[in-house]
């Protein structure tokens, strides 16, 4: 299954006010992203979500927040042969997931989460799952909503209001929520160091 994308710079209302754009996209699941650039330049190649075709299937990731150890991770990845196409810290997440030796996507993601530090929330779409991740300290928000029986993940409840979805709950600190078809399941990222260093 292929991912289809519409990515534009600017305000959501300016770019997606024509319902024809969204109605032409096939499929029943989607992720969207609105972010002012805090890491990396405001250039078209830095627009999210980011997409990758991994050995285990398609992977799309939208990231809100900042990773604090990007320099050291990126240096290590480049020295081992990785090529970066953007200046966004989100691309580091894709690189780490792609290079993980784990077999399952959730295990690849957990392997990646052990390596990154910072304040973040992630929304990930694969061919079979919608996944939400909140950093171990819960600094960046992520909420679960429901729209007519379909799960929705958003960084703020106002996004739920805009699409007519009902707020269900906040995603917990360090939680990974994976949504498979119509079932919702949860696992926590146990073992991620949540101690603060000065």
Task: Label each region the model flagged.
Residues 1-173, 178-180, 184-198:
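Conserved short alpha-helical segments that host acidic/polar catalytic motifs at enzyme active sites
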